[in-house]
Amino acid sequence: MYIENNSLVLIIPETNSITPQLFTIHDNKPICVCSRYSLIPSKKENVQISYIDNIHMYFRSFKNLYLVNPRNHDIIKVFNFLKNYKWGGNFYLLFNV
């Protein structure tokens, strides 16, 4: 799924201890989602989401986000990424599936 510049993204972490927050993506700068994740807009249509501890999350289709082990590329977890509302740009909600 293409995420436009200045889009608002809601990330719901797996643990309840981390509060979900909104973040704005712009200028290809990394944006801290929580202590573990950062959003990095790429030059392509997709936005790459990187995990600090040797795990990467990235878009591989228009509707799904994959949490992947970078060493063997095994899919660890799949997320459903859906457009939800429009508010100052496109608003997306990341659901754990």
Swiss-Prot record:
Compartments (UniProt record): Host cytoplasm; Virion
Pfam families recorded: Chordopox_A15
Manganese listed as a keyword: no
InterPro entries: A15 (IPR008445)
Keywords: Host cytoplasm, Late protein, Virion
One Gene Ontology cellular component annotation held by this UniProt entry: virion component
Protein family: Belongs to the chordopoxvirinae A15 family.
Subunit relationships: Part of a complex composed of A30, G7, F10 kinase, A15, D2, D3, and J1.
Function of the protein: Late protein which is a part of a large complex required for early virion morphogenesis. This complex participates in the formation of virosomes and the incorporation of virosomal contents into nascent immature virions. A15 is required for the stability and kinase activity of F10.
Name by which UniProt lists this protein: Core protein A15 homolog
